[in-house]
Amino acid sequence: THSAAKPSSAEPTRRLAVSQTPPLVHGVVPLSREMPPQNLMPVPDKPGTWTPPYEEPAWIAIWQNRKFDIVVLVIGLAVLSFVLIFQDWLARHPTALTRLRNGFHVYTLFFIGWWGLAQLSVINVLTFVGSVMQGFRWENFLIDPMLFILWGFVAVTLLLWGRGVYCGWLCPFGALQELILLAARRLKLPEMEFSDAVHERLVALKYIILILLFGLSLQSIVDAASYAEVEPFKTVISMRFQREWHYVAYAVALIGIAAINRKFYCKYLCPLGAALSIPGRFRLFEWWLRRRKECGKPCQVCAHQCSVRAIRPTGEINAN
């Protein structure tokens, strides 16, 4: 029989255990077989002294590989923060503000959307709620750096200014609708708006959709995700229209309607907007839209200027 190799004097003495059963010879384990090193694993002399090697979380490598995306996103959010903080000064220069806003929509659509694939979704909200209820783990949300940073920024701005920051500036599909509307105005396409009575009733649709999706998510997030295709985001942003024809037809129809009815989908069908409006009602600051005694009566400037009809005739903000 061959004797086992003696351990090197430079290494601490330790026992070796067989990690794999050696092959049988005529149904018998040969006693004289010398086990190859790859079939052996170290066993600690004292129980509980061996610890597995440290493995770096996967999300760290992903963040390191996407440094460029992270830097460009942070710069964009810094520019938007400047706009929000100095909005009174920018409002005195409407032409410059309009150009800045249009340029930011291009950035949102092409970089945040089609390049970074950072289109937020109602499924993100439902997944977060489910995670809180069943056991929250940061690793599940850190895996995509752009989504994580964007959601963090949106959470802060929701409390400060409401959901208008995301819906009006950072939503890639919303930016696409704004750019489509801009092209439609230059082509002098007709505008179509519903009456106030019809508008107020249609607004309720997105809340009904949100409630239904939330109920489904309690049973199965997979089922909720399939019905969340009411959002055209996956078709337009994530897959760039490379899908089955009925998904593409639905998305194109919504974009076409947006050319004559500004942000139709956002106003009436978007469950993400409905979800964001709930915490947005508790924003800390009202000074970003100052009220005066003339607001609503007789002045109707804000109500007429706001093309998404977020200002009531009374001059109050319509959080819906």
List each language-model region with its residue ranges.
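Long, low-complexity, intrinsically disordered cytosolic termini of multi-pass membrane proteins
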Residues: 319-320
